Each structure stands twice: as structure tokens, then as C-alpha cells.
Amino acid sequence: MIKSNDAITYLKSHSHKKGYDTGYHTLKVGTTVLKGQRNPEERIFDVDYDFTKKRVLDLGCNRGGMLFEIQDKVEYAVGIDHDSNVINCCNVLRCHNKANNLNFYVHDLDTMNLQDLNLYGPFDIAFMLSMSRWLKKWKTYINWIGTNCKACLFETNGSNQDEQIELLAEHFNVKIINDHSFDDANKVYDRKLLLCTK
């Protein structure tokens, strides 16, 4: 097990976001809260979804904040990101928390064979939070989620947010949870949080 002080030191020393303790996600290490740009607890607070015993996929998980927020509820969860630095941070916190139901992997989502996702599943719900702006294959991922998952927690991002919502609506009933991303400390509020269910 990794001790709290060692985990805190590691996470802080690997933060590449100026002005934040631990980069993109606010993370909890024991009773210590390390401030990040986005607060997963606030981000998921209004989501009316029962994560109990669910199998969760987080595409573009960054430092895993969303999965750590629900680690005590889920059967298992898989986080994927292209950045090995953030995945290493996930694994340090995973070891500290003894969160054996969470796993984190490095993959470039734009070059990954989507069939490889089936190796990690099956999944009840997929998270695709603020990713569409950065993914060339965002439509392919939405279609995969629509075929393979019963639900999707999705945050729009970029100039084509209406198009993202329209594609989700081809697969799911789309409910707007928050019409602005108020948890963002950088005050980038123009994203919508959606719960998509069948």
C-alpha cells in the first residue's frame, strides 16, 4: 500500500496544471483534498443514476477523479487515457485506496481498435466527458457506446455541441443534467452534462 503522504507528494509533483495541486481533477487522499480544475464530486452530484454494482468505462479518464468518486459503489470500472503520466497518477491513488475494482490503461483513443474495448467489458455505462473536441473519432465512440452500453454520461465540448447531442439522441434518451459546467475552476462554462439512457 502507498502511504497518504507519499501519494500526496507524487500527485502534486506530477501536476502539470499551474495553480492546481493535482492537475485536472480534484482528488481526495484520505482526508486531504488536492485541488484540481474540475471537481468530480460536484460534477456527478446531480446525476440521477444508480452506480451500485455497475460496470463503468471512462474514455479520457485523465486522473481518474470521476471513477474514484464512485469507487465504493461500482462492481468495476476501467479508465482509459492517452497520457501515461495521468494513468500513473491514477494507479498511485488506486494503490493507496486499495481500489481493486478500478483499472487504468494507456491507449490513444484515435488509433485504438474499438473492439479492444470489449476485452475490458462488458459495461453498463460509459463516461465520455468533455472529449469530443479532442477526439477525431468521437462519432465512432458514441456509436460504439450506443451499441454496447445501456447508458452514457456525456459532457459536450467544442463548437459542434448540437451535433454531439443529435448523435447521442439516435441511441439514447438524452437528459440535460447541467447546461453549464459550473464545477470548472477555470470558468469554462460552455459545456453541457448529459445523462443518456435507454
Annotate the PLM regions.
Residues 1-73, 77-120, 129, 192:
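Conserved N-terminal segment of class I S-adenosyl-L-methionine
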Residues 124-137:
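A short SAM/SAH-binding and catalytic strip from SAM-dependent methyltransferases
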Residues 167-198:
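Rossmann-like AdoMet/SAM-dependent catalytic core
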Residues 149-161:
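Conserved beta-strand signature within the Rossmann-like core of class I S-adenosyl-L-methionine
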Residues 66, 137-140:
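Extended catalytic core of nucleotide-activated donor transferases of GT-like folds
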Residues 144-148:
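Short, conserved loop/helix-junction motifs that constitute active-site signature segments
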